[in-house]
Amino acid sequence: MSNTKDTSTEDRIKAAARKVFHQKGFAGTRTRDIAEEAGINHAMLNYYFRSKEKLFEIVMMETMGQFFKGVGVILNDESTSLEEKIERVVANYSDLLLEEPDLPTFMFNEVRANPEPFVANTPILQALEHSVLARQYAEAVAQGRITEPNLMHTVLNVISLVIFPFIAQPIFTALSRTDKEAYKALMLQRKTLIPQWIKAILFLPNRAE
């Protein structure tokens, strides 16, 4: 076998690994599963990536990057209001999860099993605390415009409303006999509704910008 690695093959392996890891998690995935998904033999997989652990580390880092990509720009945009930032964060994650519905279950399961790499490589709370959004939120509290002084409650509400329906999709669709297309339509409706709900909970009447 040549010592020159083909980047297209490497990318194909990573794409296959991403798909399989997202569906089965680290513990449930065999390297043979990834090789089959990539359409290569097991020896070639080992040539490009020496271990399942190494390949998983790459996939996890890329997944976290995708999950938080663009949020920093939204949180620190001086030209948008607090209300607009809420709308954009919801839209950002709704669009991502409609494309990658297995992503939240994968991330939560793997972070729960091994939280240290996530904490070390994703200082999201620190970034949030020093963001333009946090400053705008504090100003809104001081002005008496919003009802909840703790930003973390609002963050958790947004995360829960956006992400939980994707985690609960298998249960909901089975119990309600809803097909995937109908469920996707429901998620698209929520993309518009969630910011309305958050603002209705958060802002005092006639105090939203």
Regions found by a protein language model. Give the residues of each.
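N-terminal intrinsically disordered/low-complexity leader segments
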Residues: M1-S8, A15, K19, N206-E209
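Amphipathic alpha-helical segments used for helix-helix packing
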Residues: L98-V119, Q169-R177
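Helix-turn-helix
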Residues: R12, V20-K54, I58
